[in-house]
A protein has these predicted regions:
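Structured, active/binding-site neighborhoods that engage oxygen-rich ligands
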Residues: 1-356
Length: 356
């Protein structure tokens, strides 16, 4: 396979920056939105002025920059994918992504059940005490991971409900799935990995297709596509899979709304509240498309009456994959919880994916 990421020193540097940007941008959007996740737009404006949020603000406990389960699960996705890439390199065989990501999600579940690292844990994300915070994790993620389902990496994506929480399409699938687009240069492969791993917790096809679509968008962005171009390519990929219609309709609505210009929180709310996967994805894409700057896009993605941390996280993933970490507002980023660990994990993933 001709891997563009290794074609030149410049390409390698760009790829590394986009991996860092995607993960740090997601954490930044998450931190912006977490403080207002359960607030209505009217409440946000009453508390922060007519423009709503214009910066990171303290959460209910007075702390600025905290991240939620969105960033936590994203980081454990990275840990699973990094292990899979290392296994493929050392043993010369692939195909373990779904099992290793599932194992990583099991470790995240452990962080939600314990007050801190167990005695003797000295490495990996399980050693990071800040990740043991319980920040309103999704019920489907918790109940799904209490089961033992490991998706078959070769299973066809038929549009049929998966065996775990078959009626659930909550945004817990999509908010954790950007790393699949960073770990493999082929968007269709990233799409399939993300969609299958989403089925560890959510069985509704819209839930797992939205996860696949974000992974595909990120994969295209790392290659230098525009946000619009990456979204259009993801739509073409979605169209090859039965049961894609709800996810595709949400993305098309985001594109159409962005084409109108004049962004506003009221227009964001025409896309939904973001509690379900396709709405969260559509809001993240819309905010990234319709604005002219990274800060404005992130703020638009969280100023609404819905799941602001998830929509902010998705928007941040997209913006960071497009612009790299250098394009993120560093004054804001400096306030984000765990940023040094996130950056180091991003560099580890990029390094592993670049090794022969």
């Amino acid at each position: 396979m001709n891997d563009w990421r290794k074609s030149s020193l410049e390409s390698t540097a760009v790829y590394r920056a986009r991996v860092r940007g995607c993960l740090l941008g997601g954490a930044l959007g998450d931190a912006l939105g977490y403080a207002v996740e359960f607030s209505s737009l009217d409440q946000i404006r009453a508390a922060h002025g007519p423009r709503g949020l214009t910066r990171l603000v303290p959460d209910a406990e007075g702390v600025v920059g905290r991240v939620s389960d969105d960033t936590q699960m994203t980081l454990f996705t990275v840990e699973g994918l990094r292990t899979a890439a290392r296994r493929a390199r050392l043993k010369g065989i692939g195909g373990a992504e779904t099992a290793l990501v599932r194992q990583a999600y099991g470790r995240w579940l452990e962080t939600q059940q314990r007050p801190g690292p167990a005695d003797g844990v000295t490495g990996g994300l399980l050693a990071e005490r800040w990740l043991y915070a319980r920040r309103a994790p999704g019920n489907a993620c918790l109940s799904g991971l209490a089961q033992t389902h490991v998706p078959d990496p070769r299973a066809e994506l038929s549009g049929a409900p998966g065996p775990v929480n078959p009626g659930s399409k909550g945004c817990g699938t999509v908010m954790r799935s950007a790393p699949f687009g960073l770990a493999h240069p082929l968007a269709d492969f990233a799409f399939g990995m993300a969609a299958r791993c989403a089925q560890t917790t959510h069985g509704h096809p819209t839930g797992y297709y939205a996860a696949g679509a974000l992974a595909a968008i990120v994969a295209h962005l790392t290659r230098g596509e525009s946000v619009e171009g990456a979204t259009l390519r993801a739509l073409r990929l979605l169209g090859r899979h039965p049961g894609h219609e709800e996810t595709s309709a949400a993305l098309n609505q985001a594109l159409d709304l962005a084409a109108e210009g004049d962004p506003s929180p009221e227009k964001v709310e025409r896309l939904g509240a973001g509690w379900v996967a396709e709405e969260a994805l559509a809001i993240g894409v819309y905010a990234a498309l319709v604005t002219h700057g990274v800060e404005d896009a992130l703020l638009l993605s969280v100023n609404h009456s819905g799941d602001s941390d998830s929509t902010g996280s998705i928007c941040g993933n997209i913006l960071g994959a497009r612009h790299g970490d250098g394009g993120l507002p560093h004054e804001w980023l400096a306030q984000v919880e765990g940023r040094a660990v996130i950056a180091a994990l991003a560099d580890d993933l990029a390094a592993e994916c670049l090794r022969d």
